[in-house]
Amino acid sequence: DILPARGTHEPVSQEQAAAMFGDIPYEKFIPHNWRTDVVKIGEVPASYLEEITEGLWHDPVSVEINRLIMDEKYDLIISPGQVVPHEVIGMANHSKNLFVGVGGSDMINKSHMVGAVYGMERMMGKDHTPVRKIFDYALAKYLKDRPILFVLTVTTAPGGKIHTHGLFIGDTRLVLEKAIALAQEKNIDFVETGIKKCVVYLDPSEFKSTWLGNKAVYRTRMAIADGGELLMLAPGVSKFGEDAQVDKLIRKYGYRGRIHTLEEFENPENQDLRDNMGAAAHLIHGSSDGRFTITYAVKNITKEEIEGVGFNAADYDEMVKRYDPEKLSYGYNTLPDGEEIYFIPNPALGLWINREKF
């Protein structure tokens, strides 16, 4: 049986399953529903949350997981995944695959909000963050007797071809630590000064929503200069949330900065936002807080819709004439008229940081 670690994302389609897993029968894939398929197996106490967040968070977190993980009929649970910089936890994978990938709403929502309150730029690219400590606690206390084997990779994709640099297999935290050390070396790209204009291509087969497309914001924000510009070439983006409920919240509240979103979140009248901390955290992560401009170049959603959530909008077909991803090279490019841009063909595979600020 295959249980894709989808979190709140859309289920894996038959086409995606075939592309990723070859000829494994589609009926072997079990879609995880983060609202209905979980059981509560424990709790991370409020006192521990206060300790690891320096007093910024005061509520406990329920530990919920897909009931199949607890099913004794399975004598081996293999959890494969790629370790890369991640906006919510610092470095992706390992126990995140379990507690978010096939976890429940309380853990997904609160872990995202803890990360947003603590500060994304304090965590990205690092181990032992508050969010990672939540998952470490839950794994050690509530899943220690389950037969879970982690299979972690570290990859890059120069020229669009995936190169695997490391494969780490085991049932301890050491496999994560070794993978993180290599991923920090391979997946963090330092620039010597702040980037004035960053152009990021979002592959339409992978990025169909701003929920996913905003990875370009998270991964470049530590490299973009004050007053700079981020332009996302987003031919596949046709909606905001992967989930219809989240899509509605993004359209209602928009990406309008950390302070504004926290004020909206704390307003008792906004119960819909208060009930979805993951969405609130996403709205915080997706804003530059006015430090640089964010523009989506789109073709499958109207410019008015994009502007309605607080981003700038441009026409994809117009922008791609000037910034053709087929002709641009990764890194700095100088255009015929002298404009200098920094081009990233896939934001998912790295983290870009201005060395002056790290």
Feature map (PLM): residue ranges:
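Short connector loops at secondary-structure junctions
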Residues: 2-19, 34-44, 115-119, 154-160, ...
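An acidic, phosphate/nucleotide-engaging active-site surface
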Residues: 11-90, 306
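Short acidic, glycine/serine/threonine-rich loops at helix termini
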Residues: 12-18, 41-45, 88-93, 160-166, ...
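Conserved phosphate- and dinucleotide-binding cores of soluble alpha/beta proteins
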Residues: 58-145, 149, 155, 164, ...
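Structural motif
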Residues: 78-80, 197-201, 231, 342-343
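Membrane-embedded hairpin module used as a gating/binding unit in multi-pass transport
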Residues: 121-206
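C-terminal catalytic subdomain
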Residues: 207-298
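Extended hydrophobic packing segments that form well-structured cores
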Residues: 289-358
